[in-house]
Every structure is written in structure tokens, then in C-alpha cells.
């Protein structure tokens, strides 16, 4: 099984968590693209979706799935998204695709977070994948200095502007032993919109595509 086939298997397995006639929270990224394809096969059974990025919105609309503004929705039964890394406590690093802020907002609204990954994303300790931090542009240098004080090596992601008009600093060389604490510390820096640690709102269900099929882990 190729890595992409494992992503696809995990994505399709998430369909069973989608409630009939519901509005589904949809994340961003290569694994989620497979989930959107899967969602397209049952679009008659759902009301529509709330999307965490312009890219996912475009793909949903292309398949004829109605996309709602989050402000017009009271609740989401599920939010389905991938991760760049996930540990055994269901804490994640997300934001490789620069959609972390909207992903975090949609995840906060959902009753259940379903994380879909291939088996290369499972780690014992978070931090091998650089931690994305979304920053107001004028605060970039200040935030970078503060991240250095926390032990990180921030690198400006050249040429990337988020859907919110902000910039991304990718923080390298961090062994993240206390994800909840670090998430709060970074979010406390003036000029930070949010960071890619999803520890305060981790995953409820993890679906992992493996060569032997899909493994299910629950929090």
C-alpha cells in the first residue's frame, strides 16, 4: 500500500462518523481531499459542509456540496481533518498547509474531532515536524525573538499568506514534552493569531491508514 492509498483508506473510513442530514466540518490537506471525494458520494444524505480553507471550499463546491459560513451554524457533529503529527495522547501538530487558525476554529465548534492520517504521522513526541505559528505581519520579527526564548528556531515561510492575510513562522528543533503548556505559551505572545498545536482541543477519534488496513484509536 502506498502512502497515498493509506491516506485514502483512512479518509473513506471517516464516512461512518458522518450523521445523516448533518453539516460536516471539513479540514484541509491531501488526506482531507480524499475525504471530500468520499463525501461527494453521499452528498444527497448530508445538508452540507463548513470548510476550514478556501482550497477545501473550492473542492467541496466543485462536487456540488453546499458550503455554509460557520457563523450561520449552531453546531457541527463532526470535524474531519488530517495532521502533520499526532502522539499517543491525541495531541497534534497541524498547519503544514497554513490553514491552522480556521482549522482550530472549526474544530472548537464540533462535537467530535475525527483525525485521519497515514501511519507516518504517528509519533511518540511532537516536534520533528516544524510547528507552524500564524502571525500578524507587523509582529513577525518580535514573535520570532520570543519563540527563540522558548527554545525554538523560527523560520519565515516565504511567499505564503494565510487565508486571513497573515504570515507563518515554522518553528524547528522543538521537542514538545508538554503540548498544552506550549500551546498556551505561544498563543500568549502578542501578535500571534494561533499556533499549530492542537492539544487543548485534541482528536477524539484517530483513523490511521496502515498497510494492514485502518486502525481506530479513541481518546
UniProtKB/Swiss-Prot annotation:
Disulfide bonds: none
Function: Catalyzes the reversible conversion of ribose-5-phosphate to ribulose 5-phosphate.
Similarity field: Belongs to the ribose 5-phosphate isomerase family.
SUPFAM superfamilies registered for this protein in UniProt: D-ribose-5-phosphate isomerase (RpiA), lid domain, NagB/RpiA/CoA transferase-like
EC code: 5.3.1.6
Organism: Shewanella amazonensis (strain ATCC BAA-1098 / SB2B)
Record note on quaternary structure: Homodimer.
Alphabetized InterPro entries for the sequence: NagB/RpiA_transferase-like, Ribose5P_isomerase_typA_subgr, Ribose5P_isomerase_type_A
A GO term for molecular function: ribose-5-phosphate isomerase activity
Reactions catalysed according to its record: aldehydo-D-ribose 5-phosphate = D-ribulose 5-phosphate
Superkingdom of the source species: Bacteria
GO CC, alphabetical: cytosol
GO biological process: D-ribose metabolic process; pentose-phosphate shunt, non-oxidative branch
EC class of the enzyme, as a word: isomerase
Protein name: Ribose-5-phosphate isomerase A
Keyword annotations: Isomerase
Family matches, as Pfam families: Rib_5-P_isom_A (PF06026)
Keyword Nucleus among UniProt keywords: no
Annotated substrate binding sites: 28-31, 81-84, 94-97, 121
Active-site annotation: 103
Pathway as given in its UniProt record: Carbohydrate degradation; pentose phosphate pathway; D-ribose 5-phosphate from D-ribulose 5-phosphate (non-oxidative stage): step 1/1
